[in-house]
Design a protein with these regions (language model features):
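Positively charged, small/polar-rich N-terminal and surface patches that mediate targeting and assembly
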Residues: 1-102
């Protein structure tokens, strides 16, 4: 299992992409967190409230998840990162793999 993470400034944008990924069986689950981000963008320090989304997918599908998130993301340069958990409950990983198999 791999977790793909990204951020959005509007929950509607996050939900739209998550719905697409779920319908296409590219992810089994998504979680949302409210976060505050500070970063330098085009020479200016920005402070924004964002929604961080964690997308749970199988190892075989994470490249497709990244491709779709990048293509549909409203940001000019989205943060898209992956996390490979040190441990995942085997039953949970089995469920993720089952739900993301066509």
């Amino acid at each position: 299992m791999i977790i793909v993470e990204t951020t959005f400034n509007k929950k509607e944008d996050a939900e739209s992409i998550v719905s697409f990924l779920l319908e296409e069986k590219l992810i089994a689950c998504a979680t949302y967190k409210n976060v505050e981000s500070s970063y330098i963008w085009k020479g200016t320090i920005e402070n924004e409230k964002e929604i961080e989304v964690s997308l749970h997918t199988s190892e075989s599908l994470f490249p497709k998840v990244i491709e779709n998130v990048k293509e549909k993301h409203p940001y000019e340069l989205p943060r898209i990162t992956t996390i490979h958990p040190l441990y995942t409950l085997p039953e949970y990983e089995d469920w993720v793999n089952k739900e993301t198999t066509n």
